[in-house]
Amino acid sequence: SSSAASDVYKRQLQRPLDFAAVTDHAEYFGLINVCRSDPQRPYCQELAEAAAEKSRRGFVEIFLPLIVSGERNCLVDAASCSDSEANLWQRSIDAAEAANQPGKFTTFVASEWTASPDNLHWHRNLIYANANVPKRAINSFDQPTQETMWQALQEQCQDQPPCDVVAIPHNSNIGLGGSFNTDGHSEKLLGLRAQFERLVEIHQHKGSSECYPGSLYSDEACNFEIALP
């Protein structure tokens, strides 16, 4: 956006944050960057209108099918799509580095791996320790399973020091336990999981993994957007 920060942010926390990370969906870097470059494309206009509308209809009819399709859609040929993805990933890296203030405010390079099998959330927020990160953002098109995601983090990050990363299960309250299933995992895969997934998101604006709908207890703090355990 070309808007000044004062035009974008209408509220401010009383106590500043110590750190932040922007975890955009890596799967749509290519599409979003194409639409940024050529917003007059019909599909790009439809996306922009749905985003501006901020409605359930826009999410259900436009964004949700895009998220769960599991198919790369850049509106351009494969090579141009790859270039577009890489360009936006680099812009994300540069933005995080530009905002970083060592010792005062830490901004992490980050992205979201967005696998949604059967419309369930197995998503992970990938938070990197520094700007030494994989050349391409880890995504569920190229790494469609949790196992291939961990292996990619090992090969493209951990084996390439000083790259380091944590993978945080995100919105797992609508994943029906899929983010934590270990059936059939080898000792090596269990080791990778233990290495990368050292914490889990418990509470965020789309739900809380501490809440269980339909249970015998009542918690007023859970009375929002709770769809699945």
What are these regions (language model features)?
Residues S1-P229:
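Extended, charged catalytic domains and RNA/DNA-binding interfaces, predominantly
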